[in-house]
């Protein structure tokens, strides 16, 4: 963590000491996240889908190297269901998990002109993620009778951690004032404070942004 912060500060100071160029981008995109949970010898995964929206500010040296920082709202939803029967009575259950995050990516980037209107770039760095909301809604049925358990606030359990740091990178292109990019981030921290349960998440993103 300290090395990451020191690297970011050093790169920022280097750009400030040179003739830097700043650019704002505002964008939205698709998210696909997979949470992997290990409790003892039992391993389970929960895929979720959603979207992100926010803005990013990039400072470059005008020669292809830059550093960017942004703030994004992320929304993810996942559902898991199962069915069975006991003594001839049909049973069913479904759990829906909704999560919202504030994500702050800090990325180093390298870019190169393809032609007068097209630029390609690579980016990599950490994303500091703070959970804003996490709920689980349970639904079930017994013999055709539907039941609901209501929504449970997952953060009411002190063992579930709001904070996460993800590391990753991606590729993108700028065409005029339009940006397309794809990225992948891997969670570094255990989302549970308990030693008996380990949960980490990976996030794939694809989005579009407008450059100003």
Predicted region positions:
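Short glycine/proline- and aromatic-enriched beta-strand/turn motifs that initiate or cap beta-hairpins
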Residues: 20-56
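Repeated loop/turn-to-beta-strand initiation elements of outer-membrane beta-barrel proteins
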Residues: 24, 63-67, 177-182
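Gram-negative (and chloroplast) outer-membrane scaffold detector with strong preference
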Residues: 28-30, 56-139, 204-212
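Extracellular/periplasm-exposed beta-strand and loop segments of Gram-negative cell-envelope proteins
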Residues: 34-48, 76-101, 131-168, 190-192, ...
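Outer membrane beta-barrel transmembrane domains
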Residues: 160-165, 170, 174, 179-183, ...
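A short, acidic, flexible beta-alpha connecting loop/helix-capping segment that sits on the rim
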Residues: 185-189
């Amino acid at each position: 963590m300290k090395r990451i912060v020191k690297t970011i500060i050093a790169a920022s100071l280097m750009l400030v000491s040179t003739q830097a160029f700043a650019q704002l981008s505002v964008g939205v995109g698709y998210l696909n996240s997979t949470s992997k949970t290990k409790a003892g010898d039992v391993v389970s995964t929960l895929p979720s889908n959603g979207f992100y929206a926010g803005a990013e500010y990039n400072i470059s040296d005008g020669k292809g190297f830059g550093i960017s920082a942004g703030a994004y709202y992320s929304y993810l939803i996942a559902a898991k269901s199962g069915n069975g029967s006991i003594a001839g009575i049909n049973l069913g259950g479904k759990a829906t998990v909704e999560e919202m995050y504030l994500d702050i990516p800090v990325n180093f980037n390298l870019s190169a002109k393809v032609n007068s209107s097209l630029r390609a770039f690579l980016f990599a760095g950490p994303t500091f993620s703070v959970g804003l909301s996490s709920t689980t809604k349970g639904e079930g049925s017994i013999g055709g009778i539907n039941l609901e358990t209501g929504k449970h606030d997952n953060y009411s359990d002190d063992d579930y951690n709001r904070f996460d740091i993800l590391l990753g990178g991606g590729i993108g292109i700028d065409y005029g004032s339009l940006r397309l990019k794809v990225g992948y981030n891997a969670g570094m921290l255990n989302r549970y404070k308990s030693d008996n349960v380990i949960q980490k998440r990976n996030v794939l993103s694809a989005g579009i942004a407008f450059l100003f």
